[in-house]
Amino acid sequence: TTLFRSLISCLYLSVGAQTPQPIKQFLRKPYMEGASFSLIVKEVNSGETVFAYDTIRQLTPASVMKTVTTATALEILGEDYRFPTTLEYDGSIENGLLKGNLYIKGSGDPSLGSAHFAPDHKRFLQEWISALKKVGIHKIQGAVIADESIFDTEGTSLKWVGEDMGSYYGAGSYGICVFDNLYKLGLQTGAPGTRPKLKGTEPELSGIHFHNYLTTQQVSSDSSFIVGAPFATDRYLYGIVPANREWYPLKGDIPDPTLFLADYLTRQLEHEGITVGESPSCFRILREAGRWQPGKRTEIVTTYSPTLREIVEVTNHVSHNLFADALIKTIGLRYTP
């Protein structure tokens, strides 16, 4: 980082000048052997090129493109923009019984429950439960339904490589996201050459079937993959993990974060003594079954995300793929015909 800052500080010289010493030092580093390097720096207001180095070389921009996405989001949405997630109901409340369904209305917020905003990232759950009790709901006749209809169901691109499907860094972006759309799978590993035991997930996932093809070796870190398609309940585990660990975590993507949140909230409600009569569901499932019924709903409480400025800071600092995908989809909504 220090070298990079020194490099940038030396760039305010004419384009025709010799290559600055910091760049020469950078290019002589062992990790740059065989690598390609290109750089251009422009003055923001005038557009004048301050420094250029091998600018005709074609390079893959990779996550540098996140800066374009986040800058565009700040320009269009504004740095104080916040994503709303609303708890709503239809039907009526009679003597503590909700004669209808409870809805989670999403707006594409990628930061709901995100660990990057700890320690208060799970506070929204208690806020929702408290709000339900405040309006007098102690029993739900219908179901908890997540409404992710603001975005389509293509949370991941069909052009992504197969090994990214199921990985935490390849988590899909949907109208409702939660907990960074990732889970941790705990492993208990034994002697080298053995298969590790699966110790459950955090958060707890319902209905997921893991096919375990992992093996242990005497290594310090894993080289493994969790592979699986969006919405699919099967996940395949491949690769190697360190031997003799009482608990070793692997991270994967929540296959259907929208349905997961409906299920998760249902379990939290029942833990708090608020019973739910029907199984959790979501817009995608109900629409495919021809049972989606749009209609009038009553707002109970709205949870707002951190500011866009804060979300952008996380996006660029940790190179958060999910956040970037959600931002570009949100920008696109502003230009939907």
Regions found by a protein language model. Give the residues of each.
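Conserved serine DD-peptidase/penicillin-binding transpeptidase domain
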Residues: Q25-L27, I76-P337
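Beta-lactamase-like hydrolase cores
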Residues: V15-Q58, P84, Q126, S130-G136
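Short active-site loop at a secondary-structure junction
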Residues: A52-T72, I76
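Hydrophobic h-region of N-terminal signal peptides that target proteins for export
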Residues: S6-A17
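Hydrophobic (often cysteine-bearing) scaffold residues that line and stabilize catalytic clefts
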Residues: T19, P61, M65, L261, ...
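Short glycine-rich, polar/acidic loop-and-turn segments at beta strand-coil junctions
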Residues: E43-N45, S63, L74, G108
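Short, small-residue-biased leader/transition segments that mark boundaries at the very start
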Residues: T1-L3
